[in-house]
Amino acid sequence: MLNAKLTKNRLKTKQQLFSKSIPLLKQLSVLRIFLFLCFPLFVLAQAKPPPTGPQLPKRINEKKITPNSSNANALDSLSVNATDADISITDYLIISQARDTIHVDTTLTMAKYYKFNSQRSDNFAYLPLNNSGQALNPLSLETWYKETAPAVGFKAKESQRFLPHQFGYYHVPTPLSELFFKTTQSQGQSTDVLITANIHPRLNYAIGYRGHRSLGKYQHQISGRSQLRFSTRYENPNGRYRLRLQIMNQKISQQENGGLNEASIQDFESGDDEFFDRERLEVNFENATNNFIGKRYVLEQDYLLLRSNDSLQTPRLRLGYRMQSDIQDNRFSQDQAYSGYGDLAANLTKPYDHVYYSLRQFDAYTILTSPTIGWFSGHIRHHKYSYKEAEQLVNPSINEDAYAVGGEWRKRFGSLDFRASAEIGISGDRIGNYVFGEIKQPLFSSFTLTAGLRWQQQHPGFVFEQFTSSYADYQWKNTPEMEQRTAIFAQLSHPHFGKLSLTTTHINNYAYY
């Protein structure tokens, strides 16, 4: 009797667990997702020896596959010897937007430990806010980017975003995947996934996703973001035609609470054990949210016009173009106004700020390499940018076209590497300029000394020029001055002992919001 009851209970439990069958369409959908994730495991990117004969001229490094094989870049000499019998970690390459190449690093070091966070970067010289992934306050103003177009100007939240230079292109002899996972404060997780494979020795794709959600220690402080990125690069068999494509979409949501109220500040400073639980502390409001949506697309193609069998003696000329579109949508919404920010503007019942920014760039460039001048690239760039406050009719939108010219020169003088770049605006009221120069000299015992200078002039951002908040006290229209930075830097590096750097920076008209 007991066995019959146990059998009956097991059957009943089994019927409850499988009382509803999974629909066929849902099974097929799950199967498609499973096959998509497993696809890189079955892809083999093996380099076959090129055919020989009179129809294919012999070239130097014929059996090597390099992301810049026709670029002849003396300062970027990493290459892949893609033979099945000899594959090492140095054959897995990461190519930056500037076509600098490094190999994938799988070592476990202290530097990797400090990068084990939601930003996947070392937070040295940054002060993080209380919640994981919320924002980082910079303690140093050393970081800069080679950009002359004006940005939207919300610098306080910039650390949450995936910036263009943080994602590059790949070349791998076998499929490569990278997984990051970490729990966050109170409740939530942070993850970063990258899958890349060479479908063909000259065709690569990479797809990555970064997700983050953290509840935080205080009330109404949830931080979350979802960032998807994709890149692909192709080079035809003779190395003349090259294509690069990059797509990046991101969505960031951050609850805002205005900080602790006066009573909670006193409770916090008292050190009472009761308030070690930060959720007991009251905040100024619990009804505001910041939302950011960003989309970025980059398409780049070039073609080698002049070439020869001997790439070390004959100049090579390459022509190309690059198109980029960057769209940002910033929104701040609040269910009820907070008296600490003042009164609302006329005819408004609750705060809602919406700023839209778009930047479109088109570059036409040429790359010349020769034993005499080294590597030189020149370009002319067309900027088309707009800034609009979607819900406000007080200030008109800003739309402007601007042009700039620039170039980059790389040359090796014996053991000394020299690199210089510049871009100068030739039209447009808000376009900036920059000049950069750097030398690198190997020293004794694998030590390397790097020194240089940089100068930059850039618009601080459209939000400093005009902004119409729902709060009447946060509305302005100005004519901001250009932000100017001058820096001199030096760095002593060693592959085992690390880096020691010194930078002195002088900044005029610095703006922060």
Regions found by a protein language model. Name each.
Residues 45-115:
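Sec-dependent signal peptide cleavage junction
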Residues 189-211, 220-253:
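Transmembrane beta-barrel wall of Gram-negative outer-membrane proteins
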